Regions:
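A cytosolic small-molecule/anion-sensing beta-strand core signal
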Residues: 24
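Acidic, metal-coordinating catalytic segment for phosphate/diphosphate chemistry
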Residues: 1-19
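Unchanged
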Residues: 45-68, 79-136
C-alpha cells in the first residue's frame, strides 16, 4: 500500500487531502467522527496517486460505494491544530456522483469507519438537506457558502484556525 502524503514530526504536521462533495436529491452526504464536527468525506492522497484516484479509493474503503469524480470546485489552504501540533493542510474538493445509488442508504444516518495512523475511527455518515448546512458546523467552514451558492467555479480559500 502506498504511503499517504502526511508528514509529522514533533513540531508540526503537513497533510495533503482531497474531499468529495456528494449531493443527491437535494441532500449532501457528510462524515461525522464521534465527538467531532461534520466534515466533507475524503482522505489523504497517497504518493503517486491522483486526487481523483484517492477519492474513488476513499469512497470504496469507507462506504463501499463507487463514485464518478466530476469537477474540481475548491482548493483550500488550511491551518489547524492536529492534537498539540499545528497542521498545514492542502486540500482539493470535487463534486462527485454515485455510480449506483443503491450501494448505500440515500437518507438518514449510517455507520462506517476509517483508519488513520493505524487507529480505527468510527464514523457516522449523515445525509443532510442543503438548508441544514446553514445551521451546523461543517469542516471546512469556508467551503459551505460556496457549496450552497451552487457555483461550479473553482473557489480558493484560506482557513486559519491557529
Amino acid at each position: 500500500m502506498a504511503k499517504d502524503i502526511l508528514f509529522k514530526n514533533e513540531d508540526f504536521v503537513f497533510s495533503y487531502r482531497v474531499g468529495g462533495i456528494l449531493i443527491h436529491e437535494g441532500k449532501i452526504l457528510l462524515q461525522k467522527p464521534k465527538n467531532d464536527d461534520y466534515a466533507i468525506i475524503g482522505g489523504h492522497i497517497a504518493l503517486f496517486e491522483t486526487t481523483g484516484e484517492t477519492l474513488i479509493r476513499e469512497f470504496q474503503e469507507e462506504l463501499h460505494a463507487d463514485i464518478e469524480v466530476q469537477k474540481l470546485i475548491a482548493v483550500g489552504e488550511i491551518f489547524f491544530p492536529w492534537g498539540k501540533r499545528p497542521c498545514h493542510q492542502l486540500a482539493m474538493y470535487y463534486l462527485v456522483k454515485l455510480k449506483d445509488p443503491s450501494q448505500i442508504p440515500t437518507d438518514g444516518v449510517f455507520h462506517g469507519y476509517d483508519d488513520l495512523d493505524n487507529e480505527r475511527i468510527d464514523l457516522d455518515f449523515c445525509w443532510l438537506s442543503l438548508e441544514e448546512l446553514k445551521n451546523i458546523k461543517v469542516y471546512p467552514e469556508e467551503l459551505i457558502p460556496h457549496i450552497l451558492s451552487g457555483s461550479e467555479e473553482i473557489f480558493h480559500f484560506v482557513s486559519r484556525q491557529i
